[in-house]
Amino acid sequence: ACFTLHARKDERVREYISPERIVWTQEAERISHPEYLLREGNGQADLTNSHICVMKSSDTAHPAILLDFGKELHGGLQIVTGMPGDHSPVRIRVRFGESVSEAMAESGSKGVTNDHAVRDFEMTVPWLGVRETGNSGFRFVRIDLLDSNRELHLKEVRAISIYRDIPQRGSFSCSDERLNHIWATGARTVHLCMQDYLWDGIKRDRLVWMGDMHPEIMTISHVFGHTDVVQKSLDLARDITPLPNWMSGMYTYSLWWVVAQRDWYHFHGDMEYLKQDFRLDEEILELILRLIVEVMCSNRKMIRIASDDKPVEIVRSTFMK
């Protein structure tokens, strides 16, 4: 028998980042050498069991630590463990946060949720091994030792940054450092959203929203230039939303798709790509105009539209004289 393997190479890269500082600890006297976690790691467990951060719990005391990775990123967490006396897996709780307060928050409090990207969960880590987990937007991570009367040996805790490795072609600089910072933050935010598709946000909603995509497309065009993720995302919105359905459930978002097509061509001049969707652009506009005419006719009771009428001609001949 002949089998077809459906595989696709990830267009993004992975970068491992060690924490920059320890923000907070709980039961600090039960955590030895937390500073070892700030060392540059290699992602490999080994038999030396040296430079290990050890967290020890009791029946009533359960230590925890909050790490700062220095910048907002999209990705997950890599945990490399050592060799405690007990070989059984250790149960921990992991909390991601874009801020310290979010990483410290309980789910359900002050709007903190696990929607779209799970930011608060329990898991086990192995004896002398490596485990990778998480898929969210974050800067801070809190780790709690949940098991009682256990030791958690941490050789490394590193963030996994997942992003598209593309050059930044555009730049901005002025005498106002606050404006420079705002521009750089906007450029990085959009870069983080350029994942497998162009998302509206790296934590929530992680969806292709046409209304959000247009300002992102404008930013990408100015900062990064032509990149395939834009066309890939425009195509996805088109393919999953056949007419007469509206993209993302809103007619205005279908209109934003048409505007995005126009502006993408304006910046990059890719006529071959634009030609692929000429007909759909026309059909969306025809449908919108037909609805406009129907509303106007219903309100003013001036005309009726036959099935073979062209809405553009009706609008021009009847309401634009």
Question: What are these model-derived regions, one by one?
Answer:
Residues 210-221, 230, 251-263, 320-321:
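Well-ordered alpha-helical segments within folded domains of soluble proteins
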Residues 163, 201-203, 301-304:
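Short linear capping/connector segments at secondary-structure termini
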Residues 136, 207-212, 225, 248-256, ...:
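Aromatic- and histidine-enriched alpha-helix N-cap/loop-to-helix transition segments
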